[in-house]
From Swiss-Prot:
Signal peptide positions (record): none
SUPFAM superfamilies xrefs: Probable bacterial effector-binding domain, Putative DNA-binding domain
Residues of the DNA-binding region: 7-26
Residue stretches making up the HTH merR-type domain: 4-74
Keyword Lipoprotein: no
Name of this protein: Uncharacterized HTH-type transcriptional regulator YdfL
Gene: ydfL
Organism: Bacillus subtilis (strain 168)
Molecular function GO labels: DNA binding; DNA-binding transcription factor activity
Origin superkingdom: Bacteria
Length: 270
């Protein structure tokens, strides 16, 4: 049986990069059996194979190099047990985080497919469940920079950065809707998801009936669709029952093509 193996041979046998084996030697994690003083070549024996197997196994479990060094420096079974239990907790945390991300992605896919496939310019009567929202009463006039309002929402409500990837909307007060002043928004809000933490100024949009319409474009193109909704309400003897909800479902966060923007107006009715 062969007594010594070159670093290249060990690299091939264990599918470990030569640079990694050199690094393990430098930090004292895996020393070769001996090093040729003239050539500086490293040679390994089968005694190093078992440790290398263990290193590969623990690295596959996600244990960092510094933790492996702690284990081998202590030469204590309890140390390894503690490391594995700690790693188990970390893996469970990461798994829950990945599940949360998966739910967000699934919802986003559903929202985009719904925005792409639902007919435009048609009025529908729908009932929506209650919605948690981060809400800021803030006047916004068409033509002003909405990004400043979004930044203020983030700062004022101490909302985490990641939850801005979702449904951000504007509202026109019921009084302004009735007065047909469609260029003055009274508030900006963000629909929160179930796993989002409570914010400092969270409110609930109650479950209620709405008239819904979707159209190509964004907030500057909304006025004729408000007029269309009001005409429909008059024809069917409905009344405005609250502030509007106006959300751009497909915007610059998804596409650079303005022609692909889709916006939804929800008008509470009674």
């Amino acid at each position: 049986m062969k007594e010594f193996f070159s670093i290249g041979e060990v690299s091939k046998l264990f599918n470990v990069k030569i640079s990694a084996l050199r690094y393990y030697d430098e930090i004292g994690l895996l020393k070769p059996e001996y090093k040729d003083e003239q050539t500086n070549y490293r040679y390994y024996s089968t005694q190093q194979f078992e440790r290398l197997d263990t290193i590969k196994y623990l690295r596959a479990l996600g244990l960092p190099i510094n933790k492996l060094l702690d284990f081998y420096n202590s030469q204590n079974t309890n140390t390894l047990l503690h490391l594995l239990k700690s790693q188990q907790v970390e893996i469970d945390r990461k798994k829950k985080e990945l599940e949360r991300i998966e739910r967000k992605i699934s919802r986003r896919i559903t929202h985009i497919e719904d925005a792409v496939n639902m007919p435009l310019h048609q009025i529908s009567k729908i009932k929506l469940p209650a919605m948690r929202v981060a809400y800021l009463q803030h006047e916004y006039v068409l033509g002003h920079d909405i990004e400043h309002s979004l930044a203020e929402l983030r700062t004022h409500l101490n909302v985490n950065e990641d939850i801005f990837i979702g449904k951000i909307g504007l509202s026109i007060s019921a009084a302004n809707v009735k007065a047909k002043q469609f260029d003055k928004y009274s508030s900006i809000f963000m629909i929160l998801e179930d796993e989002n933490e409570k914010t400092s100024s969270e409110i609930i949009f109650p479950s209620r009936e709405y008239l819904q319409i979707r159209f190509k474009g964004s907030h500057p193109e909304a006025e004729p669709y408000y007029k269309k909704l009001l005409a429909y309400m008059k024809e069917h003897h409905y009344e405005v029952a609250g502030d509007s909800i106006e959300i751009t479902l497909i915007d610059y966060g998804i596409t650079n093509n303005l022609d692909n923007y889709v916006t939804e107006i929800l008008l509470p009715i009674k």
